[in-house]
Amino acid sequence: MVQSIDINKKLESILDKEEIKNNILMKNYTSFKVGGPADIFVTPNSYEKVKGVINICKENNIPYFILGNGSNVLVRDGGIRGVVVSFNKLNKVYAEGNKVIAESGTLLSMVANTALKSDLTGLEFAHGIPGSVGGAVTMNAGAYNGEISQVIESATVIDNNGKIIKLSKEELDLSYRNSIILKNGYVVLNATFALQKGDHDAIKGRMDDLMRRRKEKQPLEYPSAGSTFKRPEGYFAAKLIEDSGLKGTHVGDAEVSIKHSGFLINKGKASAKDILDLIEVVKKTVKEKFNVELNTEVRIVGEESEN
């Protein structure tokens, strides 16, 4: 465990006391509803504070983890050592002409709704994706034939030298669930989306239709991290899992959803270990049946529990 008292003192030089908490259970901050405690959990409310926290961590060899909405993260039962930097206070979003500018902690659904209010089309696919802007840009999030790379103009990030820089769409090097941000460990502060003027009712109709399809086909009533696995080249992960006879397979309260086999869900009291063990069952079975390697889309972080 990180010596929290020493680091707390350093963090208090740039953060307000209420922006620093200790031993916070991560299950309360992830959509899977699992995860042990973070040593230190901070909620900076400005870019300079984020930059300062990261600099303190680097100077003191303290590991840090950037947390958005926690919707694509699986935190192990032992929790996270070091500092978790939550972006939930950095959530401003506004439209300016044909563009929408959003801070990293803004929910994608809020970004889509902001576009709708200004009759801007292009972000309908993002309505209903549970993530925030930072994670969405980092992973080039997408759904229903839309993805971030189609609409992003630029992103402001903290680079590895601790500098705040602006990256163009080309510099972001977005590909399937990947980007220069993910490769280099940059931290997203905000993003600008370039959209088109459209018909308000048509935009709302598409958003409503996609939400209806999500509710019909996805187990939104249970905690999950959305699609657990990346799409293998030439295949669909959900179909491979279903054709392997794995629907309804469970380890403890972790289950392969009967509604959508691409989702692993928490039926109530699953531990992170239950979910991780189920991931291994799925990967092993699909490999044996189809000789296809499944890779997780969800980010797995933290320490194993000592119990």
Swiss-Prot record:
The name this protein goes by in its record: UDP-N-acetylenolpyruvoylglucosamine reductase
A family per Pfam: MurB_C
Subcellular location: Cytoplasm
Keywords: Cell cycle, Cell division, Cell shape, Cell wall biogenesis/degradation, Cytoplasm, FAD, Flavoprotein, NADP, Oxidoreductase, Peptidoglycan synthesis
Broad class of enzyme this protein falls into: oxidoreductase
Species for this entry: Clostridium novyi (strain NT)
One Gene Ontology term from the biological process aspect of the record: cell wall organization
Entry's EC annotation: 1.3.1.98
Catalysis performed (reactions): UDP-N-acetyl-alpha-D-muramate + NADP(+) = UDP-N-acetyl-3-O-(1-carboxyvinyl)-alpha-D-glucosamine + NADPH + H(+)
